[in-house]
Every structure is written in structure tokens, then in C-alpha cells.
């Protein structure tokens, strides 16, 4: 159970598998007003998230799930030092073991395929990484997988995300 805006919210889940069933998931207030959760897509970034409204305020489900398991965490603080990160990069996987609080910069480092691209001029794959605002060139590769691996190796060195 969780209290938001002086309203009690009951979070139902399948405890045996610890899997949230989003399509059938309902937020229930003390008056048992059912609130549906909607899937939102940010067309600028492609970021998908589950959201719902309560008392004329919108909530991102990942933040609510994290708050339910961490009562002392401030759900209203959306500053750069208080971002919810999905460890496995799937923004729709809101299991508590997949959520952590990071700074905005650390959160941006945990993204899917980036750091390599196909160079039209050389017809090779180029890998590069940004560190403290500077672009470091890693190299050119004939195979995409090699460029990706080189980027991931550099990412492990330069982008150490705190546990």
C-alpha cells in the first residue's frame, strides 16, 4: 500500500512470480474509483512509460513502484540527482529489482545501442564515446559487432555506473 496526495493506493501483483500484470493493473483509491494505467510514448525520444492520473496529477509508474518499496524516497523530487533508471534498459519492466535511483548523467549512460555507427564515407563502422563532454574516437571496424564490442569495452572503463 502507498499513500499519494493523502490517498491510499493498493498495488496488487502476483507475489509468487513477482511479475506485474500491467494490462489488468488498476489503481484503487479509498472510494474504489478505478484508474486505468496508460502506456505513453514520447515521440521525440521514443521513450515508453506507464502512467496514471490521480487528483489531477500524473504519475510515472516506475516512480510509484520504487516509492512503494522505498517509503523514505521523495517521489516528488524529479531533479537531476533523483532519476529512476531501468537496469535492463526496458522502460516497461517496472519490477523493483530492475529499478534504481541514479543521477541524470548516469541514467543517460544506461541506454541501448549507441556509441557506434556506419560511416558512409569509409563504409566502415565507427565507435566513439563521450567522456566529460569530450568525444573519444575508439576506432573503425569492418563488422558492426566489433564496433559495438569496442564501444562496450570503453563504456565499462569510462562510464562506471554506481551499484
PLM-predicted stretches and their roles:
Residues 142-158:
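A short, charged, amphipathic alpha-helix used as a generic interaction element across diverse proteins
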Residues 105-108, 157-163:
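Extended, polar beta-sheet/loop recognition surfaces of beta-rich domains
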Residues 35, 57-59, 136-137:
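Short beta-strand segments
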